[in-house]
Amino acid sequence: MSGDGRGAAEVVPQSAEQTGERFVVPPAERFAGLMAEVMAAAERFGHRQHVHLTWLAVRRHGTAAAVDLVGEGIRRTALAAGAPEKYHATMTRAWVELVGHHAGRAGTALDGGADRSDRADFEAFADRHPELLDKALLSRFYRTATLASAEARAGWVEPDLRAFPWHAER
């Protein structure tokens, strides 16, 4: 991974000790892998699948790297679908940070669980944090007009109704 944790991930195969092999997985491929994993058990990519994909990214790469990985992945996906206007920078980052906050509080391991599948872990996580499955959750933190603004679509805008929980806890 790059020094800031946001570049391509380095993958060390199981035989790495013997061969010294290392592979670099570009962010686009990491996002595609996460998307394929989420969609393997889904008929459509709705809000729950967005949260699941985000949770996987946070769990495997940490919140800071997941902001970029998920943001760029969704932006590229919207562009490829001919709907670049569907990408929303503030909403994407806010959701990643909310999922990351709750994953950290839940004691979710960022390196994956050895005794349970990611799917089972996600279902348990979603059961513990049903508020994350509420598409209107961001309305607790942002005015509708703020989220509808061109500024919020194009880049990060801080909440204007209430601070995120991790800011309030400081």
Segments the model singles out, each with a brief description of its role:
Residues V12-Q14, V25-P26, H129, F164:
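Intrinsic-disorder/low-complexity coil detector
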Residues S2-R22, E29, T108-A120:
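Intrinsically disordered, low-complexity terminal tails and inter-domain linkers enriched
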Residues P26, V38-T108:
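Conserved, aromatic- and glycine-enriched, well-ordered alpha/beta core segments
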Residues H88-R170:
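A charged, amphipathic interaction segment
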Residues E21, F45, P84-E85, E131-L132, ...:
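Alpha-helical interaction segments
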Residues F23, P27-F31, E43, H47-V51, ...:
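Active-site-proximal alpha-helical scaffolds that flank and shape metal-associated catalytic sites
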